[in-house]
């Protein structure tokens, strides 16, 4: 079975050269959480592993928006809701599509901002028309974004994060959300160890291998 040895050297170097330590940390948190949620849902090890890869790379499209995003850091608007930044999931797909990643990984990244009720982007998919990997990333991405410090606001307490997510439950697959809740209530640590630098954590992820099919 053909495998990808690692993200291409060019892509890896671009990730590590970016002054986006918060984005790197966000990717690690989403990756770890997505793996555990997939496990909780009973998915096989191959799918769980591919979800970990997709979680780490889900925002890689922001590489092409880096200058714009950095210029918006003092803007009180929520960056993820700016129309221009909504291109990042499609851009991420374009960056990775010729690098040997499986359709599972690519579609999870492309559709990770689709909402279960059809109100998301880039294609306004709804329900089971959204790939399972993307439905898992959707929940994990929102949780990680709300529970971590971001350029435009401080991290929220865990109870507040869960309350806000429940208020927006229409965005999520209920089966996935309930599995996510079970994982969170088990008390897993989805941050990065204090003694581990973001760069070192990113290097360990960018050398992961995965089957293309």
State each model region's role.
Residues 205-212:
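Conserved small/polar residues in nucleotide/adenosyl-binding loops
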Residues 2-202:
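Histidine- and acidic-residue-rich, metal-dependent catalytic cores
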